[in-house]
Amino acid sequence: MSKYILIASMDIDPEKEDLFNEVYDTEHIPAILNVPGVINVERLKSQTMKMNFGGQVRDMDTSQEPTYTAIYRIEGPEVLETSEWGKAVETGRWPDEVRPYTSNRQFVLRKMME
């Protein structure tokens, strides 16, 4: 079976950032990891960057990119349609205390190359 990754990216209101990180790490990810077909979850935070190309070191504009990204490795796209997934994303404080304060939300599903 092919593996897939779901990439979920978003920003959070600054006054809710500590709660966002706490809930994501202690409630949201553990709930998602209990969903059949979910293999792994990793979180990332964007950083400013410079890159050398065209013979020059340049500042890269990442201002439109969401601050936080989570990468969910899953068995297949059908995992995202299960009742278990639906239940997991509504668990704990996420739906009422965190989700309303997120913005610039982006989701993309990618099939891993074999």
Language-model segments: which ranges?
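Macromolecular interaction modules
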Residues: M1-E114
